[in-house]
Each structure stands twice: as structure tokens, then as C-alpha cells.
A protein has these predicted regions:
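C-terminal peripheral helix-coil segments that are non-catalytic and often amphipathic
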Residues: 1-13, 141-153, 175-216
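Short Lys/Arg-rich basic patches
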Residues: 15-19
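Helix-turn-helix
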Residues: 25-28, 32, 36-70, 74
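Solvent-exposed, amphipathic alpha-helical segments
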Residues: 32-39, 86, 90, 116, ...
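Hydrophobic/aromatic residues within well-ordered alpha-helical segments
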Residues: 68, 75, 79, 83, ...
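Hydrophobic alpha-helical connector segments
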Residues: 74, 85-118, 162-166
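Amphipathic alpha-helical packing segments from all-alpha helical-bundle domains
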Residues: 84-88, 125-154, 160-167
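Amphipathic alpha-helical segments used for helix-helix packing
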Residues: 107-140, 180-185
Length: 216
């Protein structure tokens, strides 16, 4: 009678699993799911694929997130928090030019973040909407306070004007990250860094002219 024993590699993996803290397990699951989404889109949100990619059991995902929907909501919160951190950092310096701040905002949506937010919205339409709205509200509050502080005495800066500026920039940055290259090509423009910079400079000039008119 033969006795089958684990190889050292299998034993090591089991020990590592047992030693993984709940926070480490959640982080591993989220990172694996995020990686699968980046490579396959929403189709990557199959729990069995995530479990296989993370080297864990399907039941462990359910233990930490309750369901696929719970995992999607956690992924959405993670993406929203990442976007908020980047946008707040983009506005951290009040001395930065409009051009530099626009570059930072546009870059905040790059590296697949806009795609992740869009894809997650397709599988959980209510999961991230509120969080994203609150991000923009926070950014609008910061910008409005800055515009009021910079305005000459007696100038009135309507809050809805600031809200519209935030909406314009966020929509442009989000859309550019998703379809910017395709839209450039469809307009007969080269999908290059120079084209991106040209549009951002044009948008900065538009915002500056509008702000000068409002504050004057």
C-alpha cells in the first residue's frame, strides 16, 4: 500500500494560504480580479477564473465578498477611491497652471482606470455612480473655493458655473481615455501625443478665457 504525500511545493502553498490574513486575502482577490478585467474586460469577472488565478478556492471569494455582486461593488469602490486620490492630487497645488492641472486630470483616467470604471458600471449600474458623483462634488467644492479666493473684489462666481466646468473637464478626460485615439483618427487626425497635447492646450485656453470673462 502506497501513501501519497504532498510535495514540498504543495505544502508550502498550503502553509502560505493558512498564514494569509483576511486583509491579504481580500487584496489578493481584488488584485487578481482587476488584472483579469484589464485583460478580458467584464468577462473576466467569473469567480471560478478569479479563484484559479489567485490560487484560492471559490468559496473563499464568497466568504470575503458574499457574492459576485459584492466583489464588483468592492472593485468599484477601489477604482473610485483610486480616481479620487488622483484627482485630489491633480488639484493639490493652487499655483499650477491650467495646462498642468488638465494634464494631471487627463492622466488620472489613463492606465486603464477609465476602462475599469466603464466596465464595472456595465455589470453593476448602481455600484459606483454615487461614489463617482461624490468625487466630482468634492473636486467642485475645492475648485469653487479657489475661484472665489482668486476673484477680484465684488466678483460673483456662480456655483453652477464651477459645476459645469468640472463636468466638461471630467467628461472630456473620461472620453479621451476611452476613445480619444479612435476619435482622433475618425476626424483625420494622427493619434499621437502631440494631438493630445494640442487638444489639452486648446481646452485650457477655452477654460482660461471663460474664467476671465466670469471673474471680470
Amino acid at each position: 500500500m502506497s501513501i501519497v504525500t504532498d510535495t514540498p511545493e504543495v505544502s508550502t502553498r498550503r502553509v502560505k494560504r493558512l498564514r494569509r490574513t483576511p486583509e491579504e486575502a481580500r487584496r489578493l482577490i481584488l488584485e487578481t480580479a482587476q488584472s483579469l478585467i484589464a485583460s478580458t474586460g467584464p468577462e473576466g469577472l467569473r469567480l471560478q477564473d478569479i479563484a484559479a488565478g489567485a490560487g484560492i478556492s471559490h468559496s473563499l471569494i464568497l466568504h470575503h465578498f458574499g457574492s459576485r455582486e459584492g466583489l464588483v461593488r468592492a472593485l468599484t469602490r477601489q477604482a473610485v477611491a483610486e480616481l479620487r486620490d488622483k484627482l485630489v492630487a491633480a488639484m493639490a497645488s493652487g499655483e499650477a497652471s491650467v495646462e498642468l492641472q488638465l494634464d494631471r486630470v487627463f492622466d488620472a483616467f489613463r492606465d486603464g482606470l477609465a476602462q475599469r470604471l466603464a466596465w464595472l458600471a456595465t455589470v453593476d449600474s448602481r455600484g459606483g455612480a454615487e461614489g463617482t458623483q461624490m468625487i466630482l462634488r468634492d473636486i467642485a467644492d475645492r475648485l469653487h473655493a479657489r475661484r472665489i479666493a482668486a476673484a477680484p473684489p465684488g466678483a460673483v462666481i456662480p456655483r453652477d458655473d464651477t459645476d459645469s466646468l468640472i463636468h466638461l473637464v471630467a467628461t472630456a478626460a473620461f472620453g479621451d481615455a476611452l476613445f480619444g485615439a479612435q476619435l482622433h483618427r475618425s476626424a483625420g487626425l494622427p493619434a499621437t501625443i502631440e494631438t493630445d497635447r494640442g487638444f489639452r492646450r486648446w481646452l485650457a485656453a477655452l477654460i482660461r478665457a471663460h474664467s476671465t470673462q466670469k471673474e471680470g
